[in-house]
Every structure is written in C-alpha cells, then in structure tokens.
Amino acid sequence: GIRHLSWVHVDLFNFHWTKRYFKSNKHEKKCYELMDDVIFVSNDAKNKFQQLFNVTTSTKVIYNLIDCKTIVLRANEFKVEKRKFTVCLVGRLVRQKQFDSIIRVARIFVDNGYDIDFWIVGAGCLESDLSKMIHDLHLDDNVHLLGYKPNPYVYIKCADLFVSCSLAEGFSLVVAEALCLGKAIVSTKTVGPVELLGSNSEYGVLADNDDESLYNAIKLFVNDYNKVFVYQDKAAKRSLMFDVEKTMNEIYSIL
C-alpha cells in the first residue's frame, strides 16, 4: 500500500512555524502519528521534535543529500575578486536567518578599526530593510548585498570565512556545502550546525546567538589567519561524512 512519510527540516522546538496551521500541539501530534515514518535531517532536529511532541511513530534520521563533487565543480566555474579579508553568508533574506545581526557585527568591526568585507548572497522580503540598515550604519563600503546568485559556491569558495548566523536550522544545507568546499566556518549554535561542526567546535567555530559572541568568533580568524588554514583542513576532513550513495539507499529503504 501507500506509505505516508513526513520530512522535518527544521528545529520545530525553537522555530515552531507550523503551529499556526493546527488548532493545538495535540492536533499536530495526531497528524504526525498517522505517518508510517517521520524523517529528520539531523539527530538534534529529531530530539527537539520529540521534546515538543513525543510521538510514538517510527522516526529516522537521514541527512540531506550533499553532492560534494558537483559543489566543488561548480565552485570552480568562474572566479570572483575579493579586496580584503572577506566573510561570506548565504541564505534567504528572512527573519530566521538573522542577517541584521551580521550587519551590527560589521559595525563593531569598523568601530574597532578593522576593514573587512561581508558578502550576503541571497534575496528575500527583508532586502530593502537590510539595505536601509547598511546605509544608516554607514557600512556601504563593508557590507554588500549581492542578491540571488544561481551559483553561490563561487562566492563561498572565494571568501576567507563562511558564517551562518541563523536563529534556527534543522540541518543547514549551506554549512554542509561550505564543508564540502573546505571552508573555515563560524555558526550560531543551531541544531544542524552543532551536529555538523561538532558540539566542541571540532570542525568549525560555534558562537552563542548574540552579536558579541559572533563578533568574537569571527575575530579569531581575522586576527590569526593560521586559524583559517587549520579549520579549512578540519572542514575538508568533515566533508567525507557526505556520501550520496549511502543517503540514497537510506531513502529507498523507507519507500
């Protein structure tokens, strides 16, 4: 017969965006319990979900499909020039991604005498708000909204550091992609990146979800470029966890 599957891509405990579609948590839980399997993109996403719903349904973790070979090929399609130490961020310009936080962090850097570039790749409903914020904080020379790019990998590869400052992530595709490209990474402590980068910052540096923590984490790399090389090496090792064939077999096994 037909199997019913539900795929959970986000930390619903901290970012319960589905709430408005149900009368109550009890009704939402009931829907999940009608499924044959509930699939999660990370162990942490699953644990947070169970904190919220504690369903009795069969649950499984299958990482998002990450094709490192293709990502590396695409990253080499063309080159972009950078002028100075460059931090790259990629994502939709929406509240969950907290790009306003990185703009405030950029201001702290400028106030402390640093001259670094921040590239924000992506489009979304907050574009004009963020653009105004950059202008109001006199950061037009340091923070650049690059808009939607069909090939963001080129920008990630070219930058010195990749940063994710999200409020909530289930897996964080873009952090995984940055690992494939062997980038030094700083991320806020959301469930996906904690799992990908290691809870003790083994493969990338984790920061608390506030401007000062993010500033201090990025500053580690700006002040000591050797740290960039160290974490590039760690990222390349970590990217070996992504295996297309293994992930596809896991998906086929539940269909």
Language-model-detected regions and their locations in the chain:
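Short hydrophobic beta-strand element within catalytic cores of glycosyltransferases
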Residues: 184-187
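Aromatic "clamp/platform" in nucleotide-sugar-dependent glycosyltransferases that forms part
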Residues: 148, 167
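A conserved mid-protein helix/loop that constitutes part of the nucleotide-sugar donor-binding site
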Residues: 85, 89-108, 114, 118, ...
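Conserved acidic donor-binding segment of nucleotide-sugar-dependent glycosyltransferases
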Residues: 199-212, 220-225
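A short, well-ordered alpha-helix in the C-terminal region of glycosyltransferases
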Residues: 135, 220, 227-241
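Nucleotide-activated donor-binding/catalytic signature segment of Leloir-type glycosyltransferases, i.e.
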Residues: 131-147
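Membrane-proximal helix-turn-helix segments that form the acceptor-binding/catalytic region
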Residues: 21-38
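Carbohydrate-associated surface elements
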Residues: 44, 65
